A protein has these predicted regions:
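Membrane-embedded alpha-helical segments and adjacent helix-loop junctions characteristic
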Residues: 1-55, 197-221
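Transmembrane helix-loop junctions in multipass membrane proteins, especially transporters and channels
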Residues: 11, 37, 89, 114-126, ...
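Juxtamembrane and boundary regions of transmembrane helices in multi-pass small-molecule transporters
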Residues: 11, 50-56, 60, 72-75, ...
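Helix-loop-helix module between adjacent transmembrane segments
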Residues: 11-12, 20-33, 65-73, 100-109
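Hydrophobic alpha-helical transmembrane segments
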Residues: 14-22, 36, 59-60, 95, ...
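Transmembrane helical segments that form the transport core of multi-pass membrane transport proteins
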Residues: 20, 151-221
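Re-entrant/interfacial helical elements at transmembrane boundaries that shape
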Residues: 35-46, 59-60, 73-87, 127-128, ...
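Alpha-helical transmembrane segments of multipass membrane proteins
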Residues: 69, 105-109, 113, 155-158, ...
Length: 221
């Protein structure tokens, strides 16, 4: 994907910068912020090596855009799900009210970051070297990629239609994750090891404490 971005941007540093920030903002609307950054940072490092530039401005911009993009949809950030659940908002309700503002804010911030980083965004890849960039060659398992994209598309469609389905967004996401585990035939030890258990325990403890404070009336005071 990193090589494809360079290719589409014709090797221009500024275009790569804008495309990557827009990608992270969009990805964060459907993935949580941490996942979007974990996906984008390795790409940024590879792009920086290819283009012989510093990855710092790009990574900082991605962190900012991931937070803005995450506010656009119900599934973009864990607090969004909590807020929507308490307010009785569906996926589409949240999208209609939040996405327009998030889109405007994203492009405004991208413009500001381009201006602030204008000295670092000069130059790019030599046109003669673009022919050596083969994005398709970097894919090691195309059948699995295609299956994963199909599952992702179905999950996103279910999120949009969940108001008419007897399923909560969390259940839809869990079904999608389970389907990918079965399709990829990933051993239990491997995917269980990759789960951020510490983060889950942290949020569980945080919600328990907040719930206790609400029940005893501490927050009302």
């Amino acid at each position: 994907l990193a090589l494809w971005v360079i290719k589409v941007a014709n090797g221009k540093t500024r275009r790569v910068f804008v495309y990557m920030l827009a990608f992270v903002g969009f990805a964060s609307a459907f993935l949580d912020n941490v996942t979007a950054i974990l996906l984008a940072v390795p790409m940024s490092l590879q792009i920086a090596r290819r283009m012989k530039t510093s990855p710092v401005p790009l990574i900082i911009g991605q962190v900012i855009l991931s937070n803005i993009g995450g506010a656009a949809t119900l599934i973009g950030d864990p607090p969004n799900i909590i807020i929507a659940s308490r307010a009785g908002l569906s996926f589409n309700d949240f999208l209609i009210h939040m996405a327009p503002g998030a889109i405007v804010a994203s492009w405004a911030v991208i413009g500001l970051l381009v201006w602030m980083s204008r000295k670092e965004l000069k130059g790019g890849v030599d046109p003669a070297d673009l022919d050596d960039i083969k994005p398709a060659a970097a894919i090691t398992d195309r059948p699995l990629l295609n299956k994963s994209l199909i599952v992702l598309g179905l999950v996103l469609a279910a999120f949009v239609a969940h108001a008419w389905l007897p399923l909560e967004p969390s259940v839809v996401a869990l079904i999608g994750a389970g389907a990918l585990i079965l399709i990829a035939q990933v051993p239990v030890k491997k995917w269980a090891k990759d789960i951020e258990w510490k983060t889950l325990v942290f949020f569980a403890g945080l919600f328990i404490m907040v719930g206790a404070l609400v029940n005893v009336g501490a927050l009302a005071e």
